[in-house]
Amino acid sequence: SILAHSLGFERAYILNDLVALGYALDVLPDYAVRQINGGTPLGSQSLVAGIATGFNVSMCHAGHVIEAELGHASLPSSVIGVLQDVLGKKGRSFNTVESLFSGRGLAALHFALGFAETDPAQITGSTTEEGTQTVVLFAQLLGLFCREMTFQYMPFGGLYLNGSVVRAITSSKLTANIIIAEAEK
């Protein structure tokens, strides 16, 4: 290919960032992974989920990575049920995985809770009651969704969450524990 030749390689591949992370799982140094719950060693099937400007997953097993565009899939009924319990009719505005689990989704959840429109970084960096309420609900919903994904994908090698939204949400031990508690119910 032109790319490979220009770089001086025999072959070159363009990979989605989540696919690249899936291939890197077996060689990531310990400092690059923050384990928030116990799991089995690598070697079993794993799932990498990226939550940032959008939502995507990659399934990883035995050196093979299969990417999937999950962001445009419908939210599971369990997540929709909680959204409607908390938000009433406003909960119906979240109909796809990415409409909730993304930076844009975090901001939309904050607004649906009746708080002022703002960007995701201000929400996750906030120490206000409004910011905390949004982040805690987002963490609960993410934990519930993680449980759904583990039933669907059976990632015995672990579920790896990645992306700017996940880093911001799990920077607090409280919200990391909320995700785990919901995922393990």
Place the predicted regions along the sequence by residue:
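Phosphate-binding/catalytic loop of phosphoryl-transfer enzymes
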Residues: 1-94
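ATP-binding/phosphotransfer module of carbohydrate and carboxylate kinases, centering on a glycine-rich
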Residues: 8, 84-185
